[in-house]
């Protein structure tokens, strides 16, 4: 269903409000600075708790709650009474090992989740100011505790391969997007006839890096344009008009396996440069036929998994888990979805007083962005500048408020007024299990519970395997770890610079890892040229990184904070 919107209003919302003028760039910059500061804050909490052990170990629930409170504290000091909306665009999630998305347990969860040595931990968070969104994801490695803050040796194995590939791919794409300001500076191996940066170039570069490290790009990875109030927060619920971006799903692994059966080379192979490229795409279906244009903002969100521990050919896919999973004879991990998003296309007359109160709070505070139930507590956010004892008391008070919030959320969810965002894990399914399975209905069965973008409902089109059939094959698969790096960049045409709003060396330093793989010569040369372009201040691309605020921290509390 498409809403009836006047063309004049659509132009204002989708075009005029997304022009990167000085005011809009400043809103993006401040949102990026807040996001960067929060990432540094939660990284410090983890280091103090698990690496340096200068404070008691914090649970994942406490880490998420403290970071969300810290985000709101920073937001409250910016654009006071100057914008109508500002808030958390992506609740803090901490996904460990095979967990991919959405794991942010509430503080009233009876189980205590701790991090362990050797875990790969992905932190994701984000904020928006007046709808201009900044998000970040960064993967950390939990090393054995050490007094000098330095591990005894690098991480090895498939996790190290994935971390290397993910870091290289993210940094390369950042520079590649910046080359849209001066396409003549593109490396020779990446140039095309139209002398532009296209979606096909982006996909081929990322896939070539993944293949070189024996990795797979996990379904759900994307490099997409971000616009005001449109940052992918409702994918699978609302189809976004004029979608522009590169998206990976299982069908691309299928095509990759077909290609590898004929060619085992991992060299960078470009598509036909004479193929016409679309610059205007009004469809909601993702396609690689687009051109990166200066004046746009992009979210780079790459997730990878290493295959060095896997001795067979197969497909990496995702599985949605809930609180019913694992309650049979299999001891699978189970958890309740804790992140919700409001569906404004649905209305219903509610019966419970708690439901009406909660819905009013949601409509007033959270807009079109995801939220957690503890956000609606009268004791949220926690004052992170309080003493540790006071912080623990505030956390306990929020846990008490969660009882009524859960009761109200149950009716809202049953009436589809709010939609839970699923918790996803990565799984590896052997190809032989897919080929030997019976598939009488073909590819016509669609899993309505799995959030996918339009046009990607059939995961394996060449094999004729539907999403329902692939879901039934998950029991034959095995869990596999994943890593993730995400950054937001703004291509500022006015100052001829690429502004990196999140990530980078300031807050998302690469982990100490060692991979047994290396880049082939041609790909190594291409990436080397991209690095040279980013470092050359005179003839290269100007890349400006947003740095975090200066924060002095003591265990859970913040002692002082300097805001520009």
From Swiss-Prot:
The enzyme's E.C. designation: 3.-.-.-
Keyword terms, alphabetized: Cytoplasm, Hydrolase, Metal-binding, Metalloprotease, Nucleus, Protease
Cellular compartments per GO CC: cytoplasm; nucleolus; nucleoplasm; preribosome, large subunit precursor
Pfam families found in the cross-reference section: Peptidase_M24
Cysteine-cysteine disulfides: none
Transmembrane segments: none
Localization, UniProt: Cytoplasm; Nucleus
InterPro entries from the UniProt entry: Creatinase/aminopeptidase-like (IPR036005), PA2G4/ARX1 (IPR047113), Pept_M24 (IPR000994), WH-like_DNA-bd_sf (IPR036388)
UniProt keyword S-adenosyl-L-methionine, yes or no: no
Xref: SUPFAM superfamilies: Creatinase/aminopeptidase
EC primary class: hydrolase
Function: Probable metalloprotease involved in proper assembly of pre-ribosomal particles during the biogenesis of the 60S ribosomal subunit. Accompanies the pre-60S particles to the cytoplasm.
Family (UniProt): Belongs to the peptidase M24 family.
Name of the protein in its database record: Probable metalloprotease ARX1
Protein source organism: Candida albicans (strain SC5314 / ATCC MYA-2876)
Gene: ARX1
């Amino acid at each position: 269903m498409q809403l009836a919107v006047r063309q004049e209003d659509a132009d204002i919302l989708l075009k005029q409000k997304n022009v990167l003028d000085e005011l809009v760039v400043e809103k993006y910059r401040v949102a990026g600075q807040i996001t960067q500061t929060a990432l540094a804050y939660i990284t410090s909490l983890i280091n103090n708790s698990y690496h340096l052990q200068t404070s008691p170990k914090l649970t994942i629930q406490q880490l998420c709650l403290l970071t969300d409170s810290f985000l709101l504290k920073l937001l409250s000091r910016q654009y006071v009474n100057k914008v109508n909306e500002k808030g958390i665009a992506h609740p803090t999630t901490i996904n460990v090992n095979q967990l991919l998305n959405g794991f942010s347990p509430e503080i009233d969860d009876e189980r205590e989740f701790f991090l362990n040595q050797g875990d790969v931990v992905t932190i994701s968070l984000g904020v928006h100011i007046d709808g201009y969104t900044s998000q970040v994801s960064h993967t950390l490695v939990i090393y054995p505790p050490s007094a000098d803050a330095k591990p005894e040796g690098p991480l090895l194995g498939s996790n190290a391969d994935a971390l290397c590939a993910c870091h290289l791919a993210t940094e390369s794409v950042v520079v590649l997007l910046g080359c849209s300001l001066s396409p003549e500076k593109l490396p020779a191996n990446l140039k095309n006839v139209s002398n532009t940066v296209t979606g096909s170039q982006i996909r081929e570069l990322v896939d070539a890096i993944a293949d070189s490290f024996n990795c797979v790009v996990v379904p759900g990875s994307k490099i997409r344009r971000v616009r005001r109030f449109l940052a992918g927060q409702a994918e699978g619920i609302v189809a976004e008009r004029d979608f522009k971006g590169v998206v990976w799903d299982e069908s691309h692994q299928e095509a990759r396996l077909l290609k590898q059966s004929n060619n085992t080379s991992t060299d960078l192979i470009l598509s036909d440069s004479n193929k016409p490229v679309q610059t205007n795409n009004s469809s909601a279906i993702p396609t690689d036929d687009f051109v990166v244009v200066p004046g746009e903002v992009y979210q780079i969100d790459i997730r990878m998994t290493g295959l060095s521990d896997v001795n067979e050919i197969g497909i990496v896919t995702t599985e949605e888990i809930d609180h019913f999973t694992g309650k049979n004879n299999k001891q699978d991990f189970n958890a309740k979805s804790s992140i919700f998003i409001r569906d404004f296309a649905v209305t219903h007359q509610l019966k419970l007083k708690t439901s009406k109160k909660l819905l009013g709070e949601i409509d007033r505070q959270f807009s079109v962005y995801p939220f957690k139930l503890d956000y609606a507590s009268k004791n949220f956010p926690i004052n992170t500048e309080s003493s540790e004892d006071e912080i623990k008391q505030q956390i306990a008070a929020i846990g008490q408020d969660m009882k009524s919030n859960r009761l109200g959320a149950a009716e809202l969810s049953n009436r589809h007024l709010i939609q839970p965002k699923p918790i996803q894990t990565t799984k590896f399914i052997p190809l032989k299990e897919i080929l030997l399975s019976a598939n009488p209905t073909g590819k016509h069965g669609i899993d309505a519970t799995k959030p996918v973008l339009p046009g990607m409902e059939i995961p394996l089109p060449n094999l004729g395997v539907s999403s329902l059939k692939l879901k039934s094959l998950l029991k034959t698969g095995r869990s596999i770890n994943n890593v993730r790096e995400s950054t937001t960049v703004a291509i500022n045409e006015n100052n001829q610079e690429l502004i990196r709003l999140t990530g980078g060396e300031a807050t998302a330093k690469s982990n100490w890892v060692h991979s047994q793989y290396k880049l082939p010569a041609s790909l190594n040369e291409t990436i080397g040229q991209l690095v040279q372009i980013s470092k050359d201040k005179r003839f290269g691309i100007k890349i400006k990184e947003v740095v975090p605020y200066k924060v002095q921290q003591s265990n859970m509390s913040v002692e002082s904070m300097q805001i520009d």
